[in-house]
Amino acid sequence: MEDPAHSRTRRLPTTRRSRPSPGAVAGWGLAAGVPLAFLAVFFAWPVLTLVGRGFLPDGALDLSGFADVFSAPRTWRLLGLTLAQGVLGTAFAVLLGVPGAYVLYRCRFPGRELVRAFVTVPFVLPTVVVGVAFRTLLVEGGPLGLLGLDGTFPAIVAALVFFNYTVVVRTVGGMWERLDPRPEQAARSLGAPPWRAFTTVTLPALTPAIASAAAIVFLFCATAFGIVLVLGGLRFGTIETEIWVQTTQFLDLRAAAVLSVVQLVVVGASLWFSARARQRRERALDLRTDPAAARPLRLLERTGGRLRPGADLAPAAVTALVVVGLLALPLVNLLVRSFRASGTWSLANYVNLGTTGGANALSVTVWEATANSLRIAVDATLIAVTVGTLVALVVSRRPRSRPARRAIGALDSLFMLPLGVSAVTVGFGFLLTLNEGPVDLRGSAVVVPIAQAVVAVPIVVRTVLPVLRAIDPRLRQAAAVLGATPGRVLLTVDGPFLVRGLGLALGFAFAVSLGEFGATSFLARPESPTLPVVIFRLIGRPGADNYGMALAASVVLAVVTATVMAVAGRLRGDRMGEW
């Protein structure tokens, strides 16, 4: 018997689209123009200015910087380390994340939703906190200090996998839970062993999602800043950290400009591959059968009274090991170590948060820095959600003309650029551009929120966009046929779906802003630093008290971030964003 709901959806009227009214054209033009103006003023202008200072030092084009930079052996070493950490971080994240996607999205077991929520926590943690957590774990005297991994390249790769594991789990798992299991079951019934059924049936169907996740993870790994700086220092520098070194320590804008261009090439290639993979994934999802057919399997399901070790036990064991050993251990150790001072259990580290540290290491107390971070993050979140929602509304449209579709695709890719361009480049570019003329923001309280919003906008877009693209276009057509104006269609059809995605978008934007370090380290005024900046200063100062305060401050920042995401998770609808 046909499902009545499905029947009603199928019978929605399909009419020819009329030409949009001038008011609708003006409205959509404004919706696209405001974000483009924001991106042009607060991203393109600062970045291009910094690059221009390097290539046009005396007003004339000078490309000799490329020869100077690429003739230095250090540059090739940095490029090799950048690509190596990107490739290795991506490979391990995918290898460990695919079993996690199966367990958390295709199997049922008590506490599954709790584990799903927990694996999301590392991704939203500030990178400085992640670096401190792994450093505390691997330092001499730490639980894993005997391994001798403190300050090594494997430690950086492990921290990157910790940070990006959830990207693979959520992206692949979101598609896996919608796959119809019957083709794999048919292969099994024909005698194929579990591994063969998976590699010949399920894995090809998951390839678009895996490729999309891998492209994003590579982007995050190759452009990591806080994690590399805390764990590797300058010994294992990357292009990202080298841009910071050249701008802050040597003021060599030409070298920084060349490295920024190199990074833009890497980022552009990653974004192009990610966009292609994402399109394939969306087309694949459109071809899936009724989601009701994709019934979650009971973990360790019995077949003929015996466990299926190849199908259930192996991925369950890998996932349990990752969750406990890779995700939980650094966080638990950070929490435990924050209560140790002078070799005894104590609250001294937390009490010291009300001071400026040993030898006045800070200009404000940690609690004052926390208040600064919260206030700035609220402002940045409002800006990012406003701009990101406008972008998502425009990009979610499905025009009939090919030029319009290409323009929308270009707009989508354009607003992904802040994800990969060095936050250091953006921050230093702010100092060069927003200090004169009509946009003189020197000393303004809005400059840091704007810089953080630039970084958070792509996250908002990628969170809200899947929700809007899930809307059946026939719903909009039906509303228009019934006489609704374009504005009313947007309010009554898109509005309810948009509200479902805004909760998670608010949480992600707030978490990203709260933990942003690269641009903020340039722009935060000495009398009003943010919490990540304060933590980095504390771990760079000698003294056990300062280090203990850094641990306690990291716990505070992690707890605030996790709390915000927990509240955002309660506000979201049943459909999650891409990450």
Segments from the language model and where they lie:
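Transmembrane alpha-helical segments of polytopic membrane transport and secretion proteins
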Residues: M1-V34, S274-L321, P399-R406, A568-W579
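Membrane-water interface segments at the C-terminal ends of transmembrane alpha-helices
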Residues: V25-G59, S71-E177, A205-G226, V230-G232, ...
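A short amphipathic helical element positioned immediately N-terminal to and/or at the very start
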Residues: D62-F70, S346-N360
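Polytopic alpha-helical membrane proteins, predominantly small-molecule transporters/carriers
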Residues: L79, G191-P193, T200, T370, ...
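Short helix-to-coil transition segments within interhelical loops
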Residues: C107, E177-L206, Q249, T355, ...
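Glycine-rich helix-loop "coupling/hinge" segments at transmembrane-helix boundaries
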Residues: G226-L251, A341-W345, F517-Y547, G577
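A donor-sugar binding/catalytic signature common to diverse glycosyltransferases
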Residues: I471-L475
